[in-house]
């Protein structure tokens, strides 16, 4: 499930570290979180779509790796980010 260009710009503007930042770990995690939520909704109605389920698991793994990187770099920033995104209970 691809994101619309307007939604991408909205996410980038919300999570960017500086003016030209489009690929920092924060932005990537926010984009993946949005894609994961969209794909989860898709899979609720299309239970037999196994290829999308595999893609979802790959995205979750990628997000987990990025969050681990952020956590190792700065614990306080990590806690703020997951709170802002509303993930991890």
Swiss-Prot record:
Xref: CDD domains: Ribosomal_S15p_S13e
UniProt keyword annotation of GTP-binding present: no
Pfam families linked to this entry: Ribosomal_S15 (PF00312)
GO molecular function: rRNA binding; structural constituent of ribosome
Keyword tags: Ribonucleoprotein, Ribosomal protein, RNA-binding, rRNA-binding
Gene3D superfamilies, sorted: 6.10.250.3130, S15/NS1, RNA-binding
UniProt-listed InterPro entries: Ribosomal_uS15 (IPR000589), Ribosomal_uS15_bac-type (IPR005290), uS15_NS1_RNA-bd_sf (IPR009068)
Domain of life: Bacteria
One GO term describing the cellular component: cytosolic small ribosomal subunit
Single Gene Ontology BP annotation: translation
Protein function: One of the primary rRNA binding proteins, it binds directly to 16S rRNA where it helps nucleate assembly of the platform of the 30S subunit by binding and bridging several RNA helices of the 16S rRNA. Forms an intersubunit bridge (bridge B4) with the 23S rRNA of the 50S subunit in the ribosome.
Subunit structure and binding partners: Part of the 30S ribosomal subunit. Forms a bridge to the 50S subunit in the 70S ribosome, contacting the 23S rRNA.
Family the UniProt entry places it in: Belongs to the universal ribosomal protein uS15 family.
Name listed for the protein in its UniProt record: Small ribosomal subunit protein uS15
